[in-house]
Amino acid sequence: MGGARTALYNWILALQSNGIFVLRIEDTDESRNEPQWTQGIIDALAWIGIDGSDPHFEGPYFQSAYAAAHVAAAESLFASGHAYYCDLTSEQIQERAKAAGKPGYDGYSRDRGLTAGPGRALRFRVPPGTTVVNDEVRGRVEFDNATIEDFALLRGNGTPVFILANVVDDITMNITHVVRAEEHLPNTPKQQMLWDALGHTAPVWAHVPVLVNEQRKKLSKRRDKVALEQYRDEGVTPEAMVNYLMTLGWAPTGDTEIVDFATIAKDFRLSSVNHSSAFFDIKKLSAFNGEYLRKMTLEQFVSACEPWLTSDKALWPAERFDRGIFLRIAPHIQTRVALLSEVPAMVDFLFVADLAIDAAAFEKAFAAEWARPLLRAMREQFTTADWNHEALKAVVETIGAANDVKLGKLQAPLRVAATGRSVGPPLFESLEILGRDESLRRIDAALLRAG
C-alpha cells in the first residue's frame, strides 16, 4: 500500500510537470529477482492508472543492466580520492568495534593506501562537517557526518552496493525528483554525498510518512493485508483505491475526501503532505468504495459486477447468469454493497439451480405459530395477484392487518422461502423479478420443509 501511494505521488508529479515516471527494477539481489514479480509490479501500477503506454511512463529498466556503469563510477571515486580500499573482513570490523566500544566501521584503512584486490571492499570517504538535506516534505534536515561511517561502494568480490548503484542510475536517467518513504531518509545524506562527489546536483528529495495499521505499527507484508491485488480481488475499484490512498497524508481541498483523479492531479502538492504516519483504515477504504459504487450509472455498475457474476467467483455456473435479470435487481443492491465481492451472495437466489436455505434463519422465521398458515394464505393470493412489487406488498399487508401481524415480521418466512436467507434486496421487488412460478414453487418447498 505504501509503495502504491508513493508511486501515485511520483506519477502525479510527472503529470503536473510534463515529466517522466521511471520504473526501475532494482534486481541486483538475485534471491529476490523473479520475472513474475516484475510483471506483478507492472500490473499493479496499471490497475491504479499508472499506464505503461502513457508517454509520461518509461520502463521497466533493470538495475543489473547498468553494472558496468556502477563499477566505473566507483573507480572514478577511488581515482579522485573520494573512496579507498579496505581489506578488513566483517568479523575483523566487529572485533575492532567491540574493542573500541563503538558500533560500526572505524575508518581503519582510510590512510593505508590500499589498491584494488581480492577481498578488498571500496569505501566512501565521508567528509567532515554536516550534510544538509532539503526535503520537500520535511524541510531542512541536518546530519552530522561524524555519525556516518565510511560506507561500502563495492563489496570484496567487486560487485556494487545498492546505494552506489541507485545514485549512478539516477544520474544516468536524469532523475530530478526522488519521492519515497521516510524510512529511506537516513540513507539520503550518503546518497547526496555521492551525487556531490560524482559532480552532479542532487535531485529534489521528498520523504513521505509511512502507513500504519490499527496498532499504529508500520504496515507489514507478514502481518497485514498490503498487496493491491488482494483488494482488487475483493472488489475494490481502482478509482476508490487511488482516491483513498491519496488522502493518506494529504487532504484534497473542499469539504469532502471523495474527489476524482483529475482534481487530485491538479491540487496535489508535495509540500502539503503531512509529516505524521497515516492510518490505513480498511473500513474507511470500504466506505470509499461504496461511495464510488453508488456514483456509478446503472450500466457502469452492472458492467463492474459482471466479472463477479460470470466467473468462478459466482455461486452458479456462468451459463445460468442472465444480464437482463441482473439489470432489474441491480438498482436495489447498488446502494447496499461496499465491495463488488458482496454482490454474488446478494443475488444468488436469482441464478442458482437449487436454493440453499440458511437453517438458522429458516427455524427463526417459522418459529411463530402464525408463520405457516399465513405463508399459505400469501401463496393462495399470489396465484391470482398482479405480479408486481406494489401488488405483492399489498397482498401481504392485507393478510398482516387481518391477523394483527406487522409487515416486518410477516416478511420473514416469505423472504426465507424465496431467497433462502433473512436479509437481502427489497423482498417484493425480488419476488417480482424471480417470477410467479418460481416464487410459488419455493414457497411450496418451504411449507413442505416446515411441516
Task: Give residue spans per PLM region.
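Active-site cores that bind ATP or allylic diphosphates and position pyrophosphate for catalysis
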Residues: 76-79, 84-207, 212-219, 227, ...
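N-terminal Rossmann-like or analogous alpha/beta NTP/dinucleotide-binding catalytic cores
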Residues: 1-101, 186-200
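Catalytic adenosine-cofactor/nucleotide-binding cores of aminoacyl-tRNA synthetases and other
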Residues: 31, 198-357, 419-451
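Short, conserved loop/turn and helix-capping segments at secondary-structure boundaries
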Residues: 4, 35, 181-188, 222-225, ...
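Glycine- and acidic
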Residues: 22-27, 173-178, 397, 424-429
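Residue-level signal for inorganic ion chemistry
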Residues: 10, 41, 77, 81, ...
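Short histidine-centered catalytic/ligand-binding loop motif
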Residues: 177-181, 230, 377, 381
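C-terminal accessory/binding modules appended to enzymatic or scaffolding proteins
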Residues: 362-422
